[in-house]
UniProtKB/Swiss-Prot annotation:
Bilayer-spanning residue ranges: none
InterPro entries in alphabetical order: Ribosomal_Su5_D2-typ_SF (IPR020568), Ribosomal_uS5 (IPR000851), Ribosomal_uS5_bac-type (IPR005712), Ribosomal_uS5_C (IPR005324), Ribosomal_uS5_N (IPR013810), Ribosomal_uS5_N_CS (IPR018192), Ribsml_uS5_D2-typ_fold_subgr (IPR014721)
Pfam families from the UniProt entry: Ribosomal_S5, Ribosomal_S5_C
Domain remark in the UniProt entry: The N-terminal domain interacts with the head of the 30S subunit; the C-terminal domain interacts with the body and contacts protein S4. The interaction surface between S4 and S5 is involved in control of translational fidelity.
Naturally occurring in which organism (per UniProt): Shewanella baltica (strain OS155 / ATCC BAA-1091)
Cited HAMAP family: Ribosomal_uS5_B
Gene that this polypeptide is encoded by: rpsE
The protein's name: Small ribosomal subunit protein uS5
Family statement: Belongs to the universal ribosomal protein uS5 family.
Purpose: With S4 and S12 plays an important role in translational accuracy. Located at the back of the 30S subunit body where it stabilizes the conformation of the head with respect to the body.
Length: 167
């Protein structure tokens, strides 16, 4: 079991999205701590994000990476792009992503780009609307990817075959 876990950790790409210094005001002054937002993925449809907080930056990053590994979800991709246009929302952030042709690259900003890179998406057009808070953008992006349906899933739900769905 330990070998399997060690092997699993090695295949995952890790990306640090944001580190932030936060403070707590107490009677004697301020207490500073750090937060870190990270994403991990295998480059083949598995992604997870984590948010860690600690007194020191390395400890916050370590906590965030552990949380990201614990909360991995699987996304079905279509040859390095998406199956269809999708929207995702979390609090004040709205993200829109649509499939792109081969060679387009990842057209996305900041936090959304990091999530798409570790997920294994190579060609996508995207736009973030509303709040650009990195935590909300990451959650909205993961939400959009998780709710994306493949043609085989849609066909199974409708009781048809994939060729009838594609037209």
């Amino acid at each position: 079991m330990a070998k399997l876990e060690a092997q699993q950790k090695d295949d995952l790409q890790e990306k640090l999205i944001a580190v932030n210094r936060v403070s707590k005001v107490v009677k004697g002054g301020r207490i500073f701590s750090f937060t870190a937002l990270t994403v991990v993925g295998d480059g083949n449809g598995k992604i997870g994000y984590g948010y860690g907080k600690a007194r020191e930056v390395p400890a916050a990053i370590q906590k965030a990476m552990e949380k990201a590994r614990r909360n991995i979800v699987t996304v079905e991709l279509n040859a390095g792009t998406l199956h269809h246009p999708v929207k995702g929302r979390h609090t004040g952030s709205l993200v829109y992503m649509q499939p792109a042709s081969q060679g387009t690259g990842i057209i996305a900003g900041g936090a959304m780009r990091a999530v798409l890179e570790v997920a294994g998406v190579h060609n996508v057009l995207s736009k973030a609307y509303g709040s650009t808070n990195p935590i909300n953008i990451v959650r909205a992006t993961v939400d959009a990817l998780v709710h994306m349906k493949s043609p085989s899933q849609i066909a199974a739900k409708r009781g048809l075959n994939v060729d009838e769905i594609r037209g």
